[in-house]
């Protein structure tokens, strides 16, 4: 009889424990939905925060609004360059001769000269760190024969990714009518670029040099200051034009989680950086990624 009583008491204690477990599970599910109740990017036109491995949106503001995105455009160009390298169509060591058209590009640049020869690796470094317009046009011409043909590849990539609010007119992101994207589309583009792990070898570097063994040695400083001043940040792409204002696609990794933060239309670089860091802080402080063990993998033996 005593034994039966003990069993009944044990079952009674189990019931509230099970109920609490269900309540906790529901709370966890609520945490997985995007939270727009707080304004993390008050000054931005639009933006979002995404968990990279799942693509889950944690926070968003006007994510589908079509806006100018400046040099964040180059993330698609970078993707195409990396795809061509992975397919063996071009090599990092290939030497590209710079055309007058590429050398004459304005805006951010590494000051290429007409007829100058530079490796694909150094041109890609110039694109990734200095957001160089002359370098991206030189690579566009090397791959497709002309920037116009290369932009067709960029727009095809956009269609391949299923994006509805993006259209490109050039490879640089310089202001042009009909050239636009959205925070959501930029998030997907950034996520796709990060599938090519080679990108982080370039985007994570804060300073480097081009033409290092020549009298024209050129100091490169990453336009994305977060890679130096935010723990875990290792990319990805800045942007700034009159129409786009100040923009940033940032990525950072802490523990098992990588986040992608997009901010568009900020008034200045300082606010852009601070609001991007606020987005990342929010994600890392409130979200967790659980890594599931593989099927049949032994977690712990019970003795």
Provide a role label for each language-model segment:
Residues 21-184, 188, 193-197:
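Active-site-adjacent loops and short helices of periplasmic peptidoglycan-processing enzymes
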């Amino acid at each position: 009889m005593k034994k039966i009583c003990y069993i009944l008491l044990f079952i009674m204690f189990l019931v509230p424990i099970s109920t609490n477990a269900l309540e906790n599970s529901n709370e966890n599910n609520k945490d997985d939905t995007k939270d727009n109740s707080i304004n993390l990017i008050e000054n931005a036109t639009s933006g979002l925060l995404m968990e990279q491995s799942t693509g889950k949106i944690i926070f968003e503001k006007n994510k589908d609004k079509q806006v100018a995105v400046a040099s964040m455009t180059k993330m698609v160009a970078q993707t195409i360059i990396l795809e061509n390298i992975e397919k063996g169509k071009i090599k990092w060591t290939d030497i590209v001769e710079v055309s007058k058209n590429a050398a004459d590009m304005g805006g951010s640049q590494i000051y290429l000269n007409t007829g100058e020869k530079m490796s694909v690796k150094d041109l890609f470094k110039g694109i990734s760190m200095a957001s160089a317009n002359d370098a991206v046009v030189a690579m566009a011409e090397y791959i497709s024969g002309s920037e116009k043909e290369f932009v067709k590849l960029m727009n095809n990539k956009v269609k391949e990714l299923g994006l509805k609010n993006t259209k490109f007119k050039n490879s640089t992101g310089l202001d042009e009518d009909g050239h636009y994207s959205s925070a959501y589309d930029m998030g997907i583009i950034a996520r796709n670029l990060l599938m090519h792990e080679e990108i982080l070898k370039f985007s994570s570097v804060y300073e480097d040099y081009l033409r290092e063994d020549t009298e024209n040695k050129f100091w490169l400083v990453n336009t994305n200051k977060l890679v130096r001043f935010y723990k875990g940040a290792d990319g990805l792409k800045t942007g700034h034009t009159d129409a786009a204002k100040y923009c940033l696609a940032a990525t950072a990794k802490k523990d098992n989680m990588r986040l992608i933060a997009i901010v568009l239309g900020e008034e200045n670089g300082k606010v852009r950086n601070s609001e991007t860091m606020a987005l990342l802080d929010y994600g890392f402080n409130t979200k967790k990624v659980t890594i599931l063990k593989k099927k049949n993998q032994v977690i712990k033996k019970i003795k």
